[in-house]
Structure formats: C-alpha cells, structure tokens
Amino acid sequence: MTSTRKLSVSCLIVFMVSSLIAVSSGWLSIGKIAIKDGKCDPKNGNLYAIGEKWYNDEDCFEITCIQGDKGSVAQQVASCPVHAVKPGCELVFPGGTYPKCCPYYECPNS
C-alpha cells in the first residue's frame, strides 16, 4: 500500500471515529488556558490542578485541566451532543450541571 493510500485510509478512520464520538457523546475539544502556579486559571477566581474538573452551567460545559505538550497545561472541554431537528417535537433545555443540562427532544407520541 502506498504512503498516500495509507494516509487516506488513516484520515478516513480518524474521521469516522471522531464522528461517532461527536454524535454519541457530545463534543470534546482541547485548547489553551491561562496558567498560574502550574495550574489552570480560567479567570473565575479559582485555580485547578491537572485532572480537576469545573463546570460552566450557562453554556453546559464540563472543563478538565489536563497536561498538554512539553509540560504545558491545557483545558479539555466536553459539551452536549448536537441533535437533528425532530418535527413536531419540542427541544427542552433542562438546566443544571453537565451532562444534566444537555438539551433533548420531548415528542408528544413517544
């Protein structure tokens, strides 16, 4: 198998796996965050050690302070799955803390 073909197959597998994760478990992203004393500093008045979680109830996120590349610190953000529109159903936003705050459809005949 040529290296171009291997790369294409690898990219397809990664896309398929990430699509399954996104549909079944919501979205997971990793990004930069301010660091203070080797801890995550989300500018909310608290510092979080690697492995600690905190929540953004307004946007329904779970955030985890993680070890990044080359000793850096990063944040991993988990959010709700995206739902396709269901005609005749009502999208409910229950509130609370992730994952209980994730929206869901309530359908009259289900």
Curated annotation (Swiss-Prot):
Post-translation changes: Contains 4 disulfide bonds.
Alphabetical UniProt keywords: Disulfide bond, Secreted, Signal, Toxin
Sequence similarity: Belongs to the scoloptoxin-16 family.
Keyword Hydrolase (UniProt): no
Signal sequence range: 1-26
Subcellular location: Secreted
Recorded coiled-coil stretches: none
Cellular component annotations (GO), alphabetically ordered: extracellular region
A GO term for molecular function: toxin activity
InterPro entries referenced in this protein's UniProt entry, alphabetically: SVWC_dom
Tissues of expression: Expressed by the venom gland.
Protein name: U-scoloptoxin(16)-Er6a
Pfam families (UniProt xref): SVWC
Taxonomy, superkingdom: Eukaryota
